[in-house]
Amino acid sequence: MNQGSPVTDRVAIITGGSRGIGLGISRTLAEQGFRVAVVATRPEAPEGVIDALGGPERAAYFQGRVDDVDSHAGLVAEVVERFGSIDVLVNNAGVAPEERRDLLEATPESYDRVMGINLRGPYFLTQAVARQMLRQDAAAGGAPRGVIVNVSSISATTVSTNRGEYCLSKAGVSMATRLWAARLAAEGILVYEVRPGVIATDMTAGVKDRYDALFGQGISPMPRWGQPSDVGGAVAALASGAMPYSTGDVIHVDGGMHLPRL
């Protein structure tokens, strides 16, 4: 990765990159000139996605499940075979509980599902991709060797007692960011956390009326929903390598919702 140079040679993996926040990230990175490897669970990319990302010369779709840790090495090999290298990993794929339940009614099955996809999978995918980055030539001029961005949630620090497993998973992602940042800094690999607030996606469509009202009541200094492109812009800024002396940082994309206010 060469800081300040065109990014046409850089390759980014985006998990969950075919819809919602992930598609917003994929689009923004593609607009910035990245070649994008979109990873999602569907057998094939949704219609129009690859064309929207620059066509098959610039984008490719890979079916995969982040919670299938045994498949990670194969996924990394496929991306390298297709594009030649991996310069950026965006751990975006995530799920909410299929049913919100009070802590006293939560089930081990829901806990294991959410933690497997949101935390365990990204943790070990980071391991697999970092190993690949270390096999690649170091960047010249002190530029980052690679960038890893973990997409967490305001729920990493904000309590929701009807989806405890989700909050725990995102808190874990936040700690994983700091762990990997500390481990990989000397290797020239930067690791960041992007922490979205309330973003308009299919995942949040079911609570639209609730949050419309809360925005009207002042829940956030910026009284609007966030958009996938807002998250995409933050990820692209980090992926560019423009912050070579920073790692482990949290970038809030929540309209100021995280700010303590009286």
Where are these regions (language model features)?
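Short C-terminal tail/terminal secondary-structure segment
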Residues: 2-4, 96, 100, 236, ...
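Conserved glycine-rich cofactor-binding loop
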Residues: 18-20
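Substrate-binding pocket helix/loop in short-chain dehydrogenase/reductase
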Residues: 100-103, 107-112, 216
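Active-site helix of classical SDR
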Residues: 126, 169, 177
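Alpha-helical segment proximal to the catalytic Tyr-Lys
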Residues: 131, 181-183, 244
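Residue(s) in the substrate-gating loop at a strand-loop-helix junction
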Residues: 153
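Short, small/polar-rich loop/turn modules that mediate ligand/substrate recognition or access, typified
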Residues: 185, 190, 246-248
